[in-house]
A protein has these predicted regions:
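Hydrophobic transmembrane alpha-helices of multi-pass small-molecule transporters
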Residues: 68-71, 183-188, 213-217, 289-292, ...
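Short runs within selected transmembrane alpha-helices of multi-pass transporters and secretion channels
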Residues: 77, 145-164, 172-180, 201-214, ...
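Transmembrane helical elements of multi-pass membrane transporters/channels
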Residues: 24-43, 145, 156, 179, ...
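Residue-level signal for short hydrophobic patches within transmembrane helices
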Residues: 15, 19-38, 42, 65-72, ...
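Helix-terminus/linker motif at the lipid-water interface of multi-pass membrane proteins
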Residues: 38-56, 126-133, 189-196, 256-289, ...
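Interfacial/gating helices of multi-pass transporter permease domains
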Residues: 47-67, 133-138, 198-199, 240-247, ...
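Short alpha-helical transmembrane segments in multi-pass integral membrane proteins
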Residues: 1-26, 84-149, 193-249, 305-372, ...
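Small-residue-rich hydrophobic transmembrane alpha-helices
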Residues: 56-116, 153-172, 279-343, 376-398
Length: 453
């Protein structure tokens, strides 16, 4: 038995109340994500109000591209953490560390290849999504700076994913606090003080991500040595690499496939003009702030299901899913009471009151999306639960459903309804994904229960 297994830095989610375990794990994730989105909101407010709506549009014009590439990186790293969580739940710590060492090898290769290809094709991608000419140069500069930070993004998501696989979501939250505060300070210095514009926003993000990586490394070395491979555990293991890729690549592709639909939707929206691009950017910032609770309840479910599958506690997995759905319903009611009456005021964070069109369109987007938040909540809970159970291919197929839905909206609804069609892009995608995920999860859960019995 590993002497470090009882460290206060780890959290066993296979015992105790499922609801309590999920809430305790999810709260730091939610707070961290809110903090991250608050930074993005402050960043967009600085760009939109002090540089101009055109600069805000430049940052927003590349958002779906960033989701395509960063989504693959983040999803892959999250997938690499699943076998680690399962091995931890099974108390097989040597196996867990072998997964850690081999996931690092894969991540290094991914970082080099993805960074190189992204930088090479940056300009062509912006043309592909119909980026408005008046904001193209700024969008190109901002995107290149984001691509330069890909190695840091992969490193942070890999290391924080390993920490969370052992049930510790607090430390990554503390690291995000530090990085976000530094990011905001750098924004103020580089954009307001030095007048660097969108370049300043990109540089600030680059530096803060590097700091978050260093903090993860420090914590693992000092407080979570159970993750550090020893001796034979450091060797390349073809079987372990195959398992890691089978979990990581489908999860990465799920995000990227979803992003293809978002790119199609954003491309259709970009063609409507700069006002609509700015409205889309502002509304997405607020949307992500509200939907992060759904997303991070889902992330908690991936670790929860992974650990409990390793411990062969299938009944406990079902209890956890039901508890998460109850949390989702309560949160939806809260969002409705905030968004429906105050959407317009929220949008004024990004643009002056004189930009009435931007405010009106962005508020419309928020209200329509809010009606369908229960669909999004169910989507994240079931998708991440399936991932935690080790069936990433099924969750990837739900991403395909989202992509098909958004492409359909882009090709037919947007030409017919213009901005209103854009507003229905997300809701239609969420409903389509749920139509696949609900029967998929029920089948998988029944199948696994038979295997355990």
């Amino acid at each position: 038995m590993d002497k470090t297994q009882n460290s206060k830095s780890v959290n066993d989610m296979t015992v105790g109340s499922p609801l309590r375990a999920i809430i305790q794990f999810a709260i730091p994730l939610i707070l961290g994500y809110i903090l991250q989105q608050m930074y993005l909101i402050i960043d967009a407010a600085i760009v939109g109000r002090w540089i101009g709506v055109g600069a805000l549009a430049a940052v927003g014009a590349s958002s779906s591209i960033m989701f395509l590439i960063m989504g693959f990186c983040n999803g892959s790293c999250a997938g690499f953490a699943i076998p680690i969580a399962q091995a931890f739940g099974a108390r097989d710590y040597a196996k867990m560390r072998t997964y850690v060492s081999n996931s690092i090898r894969i991540a290094v290769v991914f970082a080099v290849v993805i960074t190189f290809l992204s930088c090479i094709f940056c300009g062509k991608i912006l043309h592909l999504v119909n980026t408005p000419k008046e904001v193209f140069d700024d969008a190109y500069i901002f995107l290149m700076l984001q691509f330069a930070a890909i190695p840091f993004t992969i490193a942070y998501n890999l290391l924080s994913g390993q920490i969370r696989a052992l049930g510790n979501s607090k430390q990554p939250f503390y690291f995000l606090i530090t990085a976000s505060v530094i990011n905001i300070i750098l924004d103020a210095i580089l954009i307001l003080g030095m007048g660097l514009g969108v370049e300043g926003a990109g540089i600030a993000t680059w530096l803060s991500q590097g700091i978050s990586v260093l903090l993860c490394i420090w914590f693992i070395q000092k407080k979570m040595q159970i993750l550090i491979p020893k001796g034979e555990e450091k060797k390349f293991d073809n079987k372990k690499v195959s398992i890691l890729l089978n979990n990581g690549v489908p999860m990465g592709l799920q995000f990227s496939i979803t992003a293809i639909g978002l790119i199609m939707l954003q491309s259709a929206n970009n063609a409507l003009g700069t006002v609509y691009v700015a409205a889309f950017t502002a509304s997405m910032r607020i949307k992500y702030l509200f939907t992060c609770v759904f997303e991070n309840i889902g992330v908690a479910m991936a670790t929860y299901c992974g650990q409990n599958l390793g411990a062969r506690k299938l009944e406990r997995i079902g209890q956890g899913v039901r508890a998460a759905i109850k949390m989702m319903v309560v949160y939806f009611v809260i969002t409705f009471l905030l968004i429906y009456p105050f959407a317009d005021e929220m949008m004024m964070l990004f643009v002056d009151k004189g930009e009435a069109e931007v405010v009106t369109y962005a508020a419309q987007f928020m209200r329509i999306a809010n009606y369908f938040y229960p669909c999004l909540g169910l989507l994240t809970i079931l998708r991440y639960s399936i991932q935690g159970l080790g069936y990433s291919n099924l969750s990837m197929l739900s991403g395909v459903m989202e992509m098909i839905a958004r492409c359909g909206v882009s090709l037919w609804l947007v030409p017919a309804l213009a901005w209103t069609g854009v507003c229905f892009g997300d809701p239609v995608a969420w409903v389509m994904a749920d139509l696949f995920l609900i029967p998929a999860f029920l089948w998988l859960y029944k199948h696994l229960k038979k295997e355990v019995l």
